[in-house]
Design a protein with these regions (language model features):
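Bacterial N-terminal signal peptides that target proteins for export
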Residues: 1-7
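Intrinsically disordered and other compositionally biased segments
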Residues: 7-8, 22
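Bacterial N-terminal signal peptides
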Residues: 8-15
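Extracytoplasmic cell-surface/polysaccharide-interacting catalytic and binding patches
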Residues: 18-97, 101-195
Length: 195
């Protein structure tokens, strides 16, 4: 009886492991060529080649330590998107990415003066401790003069794991999904980061 239970337990563990490893074979992974910035699809088991860099298999979370530059994986995702946009005769570029906490404080203070209250300013400039710019996980694209390229990124950004997040900021993008996933619905403004 005991041998039967051990054997059944072994079969159960083996079948679970087999399912997990098989499922990993089907999880797509976007790999960007370091020279051309073009993408190739692999999977999380095979990974990327030495001449490539992974765009990641998930959203890019905040670092545990406050960074001093734009998140490297976010930059890879943007460069891949930029190369694809160029193939479609569109130009996209980062106007603002990583900001120091001090810079975000200054921008927020200026917005409070401009809009007359913290609540109103927060709709346009996230408070320093809420904003994703000081964490290197947000970019502003083509602002203020070229919304067409940013529109291309809004339509195609999901392929690279980049999503527009605020209805009132056509220029603001964040890596909130894995490349290829569907972007979440837009929220009205930056105050929704506070909720």
């Amino acid at each position: 009886m005991r041998k039967t239970r051990v054997f059944v337990a072994f079969l159960l563990v083996f079948s679970i492991f087999n399912e997990v490893s098989h499922a990993s074979d089907t999880i797509p992974l976007q790999c960007m060529n370091k020279k051309t910035y073009f993408l190739r699809v692999s999977n999380v088991i095979k990974g990327c080649e030495k001449s490539e860099v992974s765009l990641g298999a998930g959203a890019i979370p905040r670092s545990l330590v406050r960074p001093t530059e734009l998140d490297k994986q976010l930059m890879y995702r943007f460069k891949a998107a930029q190369a694809a946009a160029k193939k479609d005769s569109q130009i996209i570029y980062i106007v603002s990415g990583y900001r120091t906490l001090s810079r975000q404080k200054t921008l927020f203070a200026n917005a409070v003066r401009k809009y007359g209250s913290v609540a109103e300013a927060s709709k346009w400039v996230a408070p320093p401790l809420i904003s994703h710019h000081p964490w290197g996980t947000a970019i502003d694209v083509n602002y203020p003069d070229e919304p067409v390229g940013a529109g291309w990124l809004e339509v195609n950004g999901y392929k690279f794991g980049l999503c527009r997040v605020f209805e009132n900021e056509w220029w603001h993008f964040e890596p909130v999904i894995a490349p290829g996933w569907k972007c979440p619905a837009l929220v009205p403004d930056a105050t929704y980061s506070l909720n």
